[in-house]
Amino acid sequence: MLQPARRKFRKEQKGRNTGVATRGNSVAFGDFGLKCTDRGRLTARQIEAARRAISRHVKRGGRIWIRVFPDKPISTKPAEVRMGNGKGNPEYYVAEIQPGKVVFEIVGVPEELAREAFRLAAAKLPLRTTFVARQIGA
């Protein structure tokens, strides 16, 4: 699963996920992409599950790019622990997603195969997505 090798600080404040994606909002590497139209978080497990769904469907064909990286630690306190006594330990990592962000890209497969692979991947993600193709001349 994806997670940072090292971090300057173990824990991070919650913050707010606002605005739309101004970077990473177009297909840059492949021919087809899976773009999120919702705002939210993708955990490392969700990204990996979607990647596996794509890989299994296209079999040996094509090349896949993961355009997001889960670099934000989410901390939780254990069950049945009273409030206070400091912040909990980092449990998992998430990628903050704004509307318009391209999450996956693929090249080397026909459009119909890419559409079906991304449909299977989208079922693993908690956000609404749409299929996008590379713009010619962009």
UniProtKB/Swiss-Prot annotation:
Region feature (Disordered): 1-22
InterPro entries cross-referenced by the UniProt entry: Ribosomal_uL16, Ribosomal_uL16_bact-type, Ribosomal_uL16_CS, Ribosomal_uL16_dom, Ribosomal_uL16_sf
One MF annotation (Gene Ontology) recorded for this entry: tRNA binding
Keyword Translocase carried by entry: no
GO cellular component, one term: cytosolic large ribosomal subunit
The UniProt record lists the keyword Coiled coil: no
Keywords recorded for this protein, A-Z: Ribonucleoprotein, Ribosomal protein, RNA-binding, rRNA-binding, tRNA-binding
Assembly information from the UniProt record: Part of the 50S ribosomal subunit.
Protein family membership: Belongs to the universal ribosomal protein uL16 family.
Function: Binds 23S rRNA and is also seen to make contacts with the A and possibly P site tRNAs.
PANTHER family reported for this sequence: 50S/60S RIBOSOMAL PROTEIN L16, LARGE RIBOSOMAL SUBUNIT PROTEIN UL16M
Protein name: Large ribosomal subunit protein uL16
Organism: Acidovorax ebreus (strain TPSY) (Diaphorobacter sp. (strain TPSY))
